[in-house]
Curated annotation (Swiss-Prot):
Enzyme class: transferase
Species, as recorded: Arabidopsis thaliana (Mouse-ear cress)
Keyword annotations: Glycosyltransferase, Transferase
Protein's UniProt name: UDP-glycosyltransferase 79B6
InterPro entries: UDP-glycosyltransf_plant, UDP_glucos_trans, UDP_glycos_trans_CS
Designated gene of the protein: UGT79B6
Length: 453
């Protein structure tokens, strides 16, 4: 291996982004590289336990400036509703002087970033290489962000796009309308991401050639930037904290592979009528289920929003829970037979490396594209059908679940076989370490080239 480097990391102030960056930091620190991790003060406490190499990874906190429209003390996406994201982006942009000072003093070799599109400018000023680390699927980047296209072109497939399946259809293109919204000071979300992709030295993506190679090649060709793959970087199971007794005891009442686990991510808050339809769809399956979702809009608790008579009807086999749960440990429990998910990027990988059948109810544009990748390219899952309005019915949900849970179902057996194949491929010995070794070697060469310039 080459000489050791010092990397700065500056992720977006959302915990999904920060934890993905920290997971990569741990992998680099494992190989004795030094990391300075820039983050809001509030986030430090929540992330410290995930820093596995405190001798190599140093947290450097930033003071998040006040911004009109941003609640006092808000520093991360968990402090605000999704509608206030633009104000948080403005706050991030206004840390630029602090970040520049940190780079000046710390003298890193590399800076990893995602939403802070001005990082490449600072990097060039100090002779540092910038790495745009993407924490969404390559397919999503390939269809959404292409040089020479405008925000108005998002409803059509870019020329040369390598898939006829991983697409948005009809009304689904509206799910990308947020890309044209203001996001930070004087820029839209689309412009912010495009500037970062065009100006960075290297693009890196948490994926693997086996799954998304053609999308990565398309991105590399479009941006004329080297695309480095970290591999899937699957999190190691945390065996230090067993599954909470409440869920261990409840799940143990049921036969192996019989329970549906449903979780729609931290961002999704359903309308009350759609929440009730979700509950009724679970009831309609006739199977035991655990649903972990936030209370719907307009409700302060799960209980007040449940359909009339629902709790009494399902009390022996169903739970709807509004709090946090240990998702990886629940998915690993032998009683779980089906995972119903929104198909966020993290949940997508979790689904692939577990044994349960997979059903997706995507909500956002990125999630829809992830779902098409999983259901139509890899053929490991089933997507719940929606109406033109975006509504999904209890019948479409229960039908999708039954189609994968029924042992006599051709669709279920087909998805099961493909899932086993992909799980074995992703978990085969040496795959992840091989990707990581190549990734680190490429970074070391990048740093060596700086020193030769």
């Amino acid at each position: 291996m080459g000489s050791k480097f010092h990397a700065f990391m500056f992720p977006w102030f959302g915990f999904g982004h920060m934890t993905a960056f920290l997971h990569l930091a741990n992998k680099l620190a494992e190989k004795d590289h030094k990391i300075t991790f820039l983050l809001p003060k509030k986030a430090r406490k929540q992330l410290e336990s995930l820093n596995l190499f405190p001798d190599c990874i140093v947290f450097q906190t930033l003071t998040i400036p006040s911004v009109d429209g941003l609640p006092d003390g808000a520093e991360t996406t968990s402090d605000i509703p999704i509608s206030l994201g633009s104000f948080l982006a403005s706050a991030m942009d206004r840390t630029r002087i602090q970040v520049k000072e940190a780079v000046s003093v710390g003298k890193p070799d590399l800076i990893f970033f995602d939403f802070a599109h001005w990082i490449p400018e600072i990097a060039r000023e100090y002779g540092v290489k910038s790495v745009n680390f993407i924490t969404i699927s390559a397919a999503c980047v390939a269809i959404s962000f292409v040089p020479g296209r405008s925000q108005d072109d998002l409803g059509s497939t870019p020329p040369g796009y390598p898939s006829s399946k991983v697409l948005l259809r009809g009304h689904e293109t509206n799910s990308l309308s947020f890309l044209s919204y203001p996001f930070g000071d004087g820029t839209s979300f689309y412009e912010r991401i495009m500037i970062g992709l065009k100006n960075c030295d290297v693009i890196s993506i948490r994926t693997c050639q086996e799954m998304e190679g053609k999308f990565c090649d398309f991105i590399e060709n479009q941006f004329q930037r080297k695309v480095l793959l970290t591999g899937p970087m699957l999190p190691e199971p945390d065996n230090s904290k067993p599954l909470e007794d409440q869920w261990r005891q409840w799940l143990s009442k049921f036969d192996p592979g019989s329970v549906i686990y449903c979780a729609l991510g931290s961002q999704i808050i359903l309308e009350k009528d759609q929440f009730q339809e979700l509950c009724l769809g679970m009831e309609l399956t006739g199977l035991p289920f655990l649903v972990a979702v936030k209370p719907p809009k307009g409700s302060s608790t799960i209980q007040e929003a449940l359909p009339k008579g629902f709790e009494e009807r399902v009390k022996a086999r169903g739970v709807v829970w509004g709090g946090w749960v240990q998702q990886p440990l629940i998915l690993a429990h032998p009683s779980i037979g089906c995972f119903v998910s929104h198909c966020g990027f993290g949940s997508m990988w979790e689904a692939l490396v577990n044994d349960c059948q997979i059903v997706f109810i995507p909500h956002l544009g990125e999630q829809i594209l992830n779902t098409r990748l999983m259901s139509e390219e890899l053929k490991v899952s089933v997507e719940v059908k929606r109406e033109e309005t975006g509504w999904f019915s209890k019948e479409s949900l229960s039908g999708a679940v039954r189609s994968v849970m029924d042992r006599d179902s051709e669709l279920g057996n087909w998805a099961r076989r493909n899932h086993v194949k992909w799980k074995e491929s992703l978990l085969r010995h040496g795959l992840m370490s091989g990707y990581l070794n190549k990734f680190v070697e490429a970074l070391e060469k990048l740093v060596q080239n700086i020193n030769l310039e």
